[in-house]
């Protein structure tokens, strides 16, 4: 939902001037034809404590090379994650993550690898090792795109132009 339209400087860039982004990934454990285009159907039991532990661990790291696509043109794989948490909302398992930037495919890779830990296919220590290995081969699959949503993008106030007439952001 668009909550406002703002004027910006002519040299502003919607991607490069953003100071943070928030993503949400939704998972449903029962088949539902009304949700199949917007939620990842994942019929397996998961350990919420392990999911939360993995999500918490993500905030302690900045190098996400293990969750980057190969042969990308990014100059750095460093990202600062400020919020990372799983919850239940309307019978969906929901992952919310906020950071200053994200690599292409990073959230989907993180979700898939955390789900492996939550199913007992990886320990939390092994999950940490995947992150620290800085090798994208170790995070070998990603969750489908249809569960992922960009929820919010924040910009610093100096990017937004003030209305000279009203003295506030347009």
Protein language model features and the residues they cover:
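Structured-RNA-binding interfaces characteristic of tRNA pseudouridine synthases
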Residues: 1-170
